[in-house]
Amino acid sequence: MSKVAPRLPWFGPGKFPLYLAPMARHTDVAFRQLCKEQGADVMVTEFVQSEALIRDNAKAWEMVDFTEGQRPMGVQIFGATPASMAKAARLVCDRMKPDFLDLNFGCP
C-alpha cells in the first residue's frame, strides 16, 4: 500500500474547489462524469460497506469504480468495526488507487 499524502493539494489558501459530495444511489460513474464535465473539481464515490468489499461483492466494487478522468477521486467506506474498515481501506487503496479515502462514521 502506498503512503498517504500529508495533505490534499487541491485544498489550501485561496483555493475553492467544487466538491461533489457522495449521495447514496446517485453518485455512480456516469453521474460523476456529467458533474466533472460541468466543472466538479474533486469527487467521491457513494458510501460502500466495508464488509461487502472484503467479501468481494461485485456490486460493491462497481460502486467504487471510477475513471482516470474523474481524478482527484475519493472512495467513501463505512463499517461496523475498525478491523473491517482497515481491511477494506487496504483493499480499496491497493485495487482502485484513489486519491483519498473518505471514512463515513455516520450521518447527522
Feature-to-residue mapping (PLM):
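Glycine-rich, positively charged N-terminal anion/phosphate-binding segment
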Residues: 2-8, 23-99
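Short, flexible active-site-proximal loops enriched in glycine and acidic residues
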Residues: 97-107
